[in-house]
Amino acid sequence: RHAGSAHTF
């Protein structure tokens, strides 16, 4: 889960 990702894992 990264705040810059388009798809959060």
Swiss-Prot record:
One of its GO terms (cellular component) is cytoplasm. It catalyses: alpha-D-xylose = alpha-D-xylulofuranose. The lineage of its organism: Bacteria, Bacillati, Actinomycetota, Actinomycetes, Kitasatosporales. The keyword Magnesium applies. It comes from Streptomyces sp. (strain NCL 82-5-1). Its cofactor is Mg(2+). Belongs to the xylose isomerase family. It is found in: Cytoplasm. Homotetramer. Its main location: cytoplasm. It comes from the Bacteria. Binds 2 magnesium ions per subunit. Its EC number is 5.3.1.5. The gene is xylA. It is an enzyme of class 5 (isomerase). Involved in D-xylose catabolism. The keyword Transmembrane does not apply. This is Xylose isomerase. GO terms for biological process: D-xylose metabolic process. GO terms for molecular function: metal ion binding; xylose isomerase activity. Keywords: Carbohydrate metabolism, Cytoplasm, Isomerase, Magnesium, Metal-binding, Xylose metabolism.
